[in-house]
């Protein structure tokens, strides 16, 4: 799940970069068109003055009728005097049309990454999922996990979260522990032999309740509420006081 979310974020960033590039092309073409139009207008000015002088002479009957007609046709048929702005506008519209879906898809990936689809009830609760994305039932969990067992499910926002089986072997602890190390984000495995969570990346260690017993981790593991709702395991955000520190949760 974490890898797929990282991939989605990478796609979103790349798509946004493509969108910015295409938009820059459209803007540059528009500015280029404005500069070319100004240049064309400058070119038009001199012929137009010549034409006006010619018309003035024509009006004074200084040219024969055949010459008057030739002057008018020469001016009106000169293609350099009329810039083809229709094609330029069409190209700009096509570029902008290409940018729109790219930006929209990038925004969709961004929203999916930071607000992934969740299962579960109201109040911010989500259903625990196994590694394949299937809902985890309390019955199946207790069949495969003994008392004091700590094992991972996909929890809030897809984060790996430890469920803790109580001493009776048939109920879950009222809180779960987010398995992401508070140092640099590695997933911290549970070491039953030492009764600690031990980070394999930089050596941080956590007690069974998730508080730090050895750095460099600066903060305890994040808590989540755990509830058995008629056999369905639900997790919800922990926003009240952190019972391990007596303070407001650092993640809230």
Curated annotation (Swiss-Prot):
Q: List the disulfide bonds.
A: 186-201
Q: Give, as one word, the top-level EC class.
A: translocase
Where does this one sit in the cell? Plastid, Chloroplast thylakoid membrane
- Return the Gene3D superfamilies for the record: Rieske [2Fe-2S] iron-sulphur domain, Single helix bin
- Cofactor annotation: [2Fe-2S] cluster
Output the Gene Ontology cellular-component terms: chloroplast thylakoid membrane
Domain named Rieske: residues? 141-235
Question: Which SUPFAM superfamilies does the annotation name?
Answer: ISP domain (SSF50022)
Q: Which reaction does it catalyse?
A: 2 oxidized [plastocyanin] + a plastoquinol + 2 H(+)(in) = 2 reduced [plastocyanin] + a plastoquinone + 4 H(+)(out)
Q: Name one GO molecular function term.
A: 2 iron, 2 sulfur cluster binding
Q: What PANTHER family does the record point to?
A: CYTOCHROME B-C1 COMPLEX SUBUNIT RIESKE, MITOCHONDRIAL (PTHR10134)
Concerning its family, UniProt says: Belongs to the Rieske iron-sulfur protein family.
Q: What is this protein called?
A: Cytochrome b6-f complex iron-sulfur subunit, chloroplastic
**What's the source species for this entry?**
Bigelowiella natans
């Amino acid at each position: 799940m974490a890898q797929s979310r990282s991939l989605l974020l990478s796609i979103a960033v790349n798509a946004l970069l493509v969108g910015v590039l295409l938009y820059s092309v459209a803007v540059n073409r528009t500015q280029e068109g404005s500069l070319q139009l100004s240049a064309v207008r400058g070119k038009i000015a001199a012929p137009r003055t010549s034409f006006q002088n010619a018309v003035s002479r024509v009006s004074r009957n200084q040219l024969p009728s055949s010459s008057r007609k030739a002057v008018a046709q020469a001016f009106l048929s000169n293609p350099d005097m009329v810039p083809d702005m229709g094609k330029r506008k069409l190209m700009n519209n096509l570029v902008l049309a290409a940018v729109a879906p790219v930006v929209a898809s990038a925004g969709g990936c961004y929203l999916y990454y930071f607000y992934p689809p969740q299962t579960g009830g109201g109040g911010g609760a989500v259903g625990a999922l196994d590694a394949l994305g299937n809902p985890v039932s309390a019955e199946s969990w207790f069949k495969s996990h003994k008392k004091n067992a700590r094992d991972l499910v996909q929890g809030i926002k897809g984060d790996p979260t430890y469920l803790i089986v109580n001493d009776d072997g048939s109920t879950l602890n009222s809180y779960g522990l987010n398995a992401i190390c508070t140092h640099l984000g590695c997933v911290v495995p549970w070491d039953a032999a030492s009764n600690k969570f031990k980070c394999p990346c930089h050596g941080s260690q956590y007690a069974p309740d998730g508080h730090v017993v050895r750095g460099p981790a600066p903060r305890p593991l994040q808590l989540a509420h755990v509830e058995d709702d008629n056999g369905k395991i639900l997790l919800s955000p922990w926003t009240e006081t952190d019972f391990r520190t007596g303070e407001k949760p650092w993640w809230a």
